[in-house]
Swiss-Prot record:
Protein's UniProt name: Putative gene 51 protein
Domain of life: Viruses
Gene label: 51
Length: 131
């Protein structure tokens, strides 16, 4: 791709309008392109693409949000894979607490069952009672 500078961007916009989705092969080229656009031009591009951006009092943060909206339209974030199920899912909280009690393993109590479960599993693992 040609060197992207202010003159190139101004000329491109004048002749072609805003780049179509898929025009840039690499993120860095798109980033170099929109770096030379004014906030008003970025707003116009975002509106043209039908994107929404959360408004803010800070001009620099607003500009960054406009740029990120365009970037993610052209280069979507990769989604994380599915989480693996816990190997201890089949053991109830009561059974885990009983295992800790039977093995004299101290677990700090909490009102949240989820946190108590996590603390109990961690304590049992640390004591070598849970694989």
């Amino acid at each position: 791709m040609a060197k992207i500078n202010k003159g190139y961007v101004a000329n491109f916009i004048e002749e072609n309008g805003f780049p179509e989705q898929g025009h840039f092969e690499e993120k860095k080229d798109l980033q170099a392109f929109y770096k030379h656009l004014s906030t008003e031009q970025l707003e116009e591009w975002v509106e043209l693409e039908g994107l929404e951006v959360k408004d803010t009092d800070s001009d620099s943060i607003y500009r960054m949000r406009l740029c990120m909206a365009i970037l993610y339209l052209n280069f979507p974030k990769k989604t994380a894979g599915k989480k693996k199920a816990s190997p201890y899912k089949h053991i109830s909280l009561e059974e885990l607490v009983q295992m800790a009690t039977d093995n004299d393993i101290e677990v700090k109590h909490t009102d949240s069952d989820k946190i108590l479960r996590m603390r109990t599993i961690m304590a049992l693992k640390e004591a070598g009672k849970l694989g």
